[in-house]
């Protein structure tokens, strides 16, 4: 779905891929959740393997760019109440909300601020349509 010039909340994957995402696929005004900052920060410390040092540096640079560009929306009491309803619905549908905590918290922030949620992973938010509008953004052809 193309952007309509409004405002939207970006999922963490959009922050990681956004330099390669088609500009018109995102809203004119974008916001992020503090939960996405937490995911990006954790990613810096979870880089392992033979290229870990270079990967940590790349992830840290992305985190610093995002921190300097955005004033994230907090996961506050209103978002917490939305999270409770969302997690309850996920559980009632027979799925475990525990494996999806960060995604559900991001969805709750979007719901609390009445913002559509832009993601390249819409399946992560399946079944949440009554709580938040999920906008599927095409993945870039080359992610490398």
Language model feature labels by segment:
Residues 2-8, 18-108, 126-144:
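PIN-domain endoribonuclease scaffold, especially VapC-family toxins
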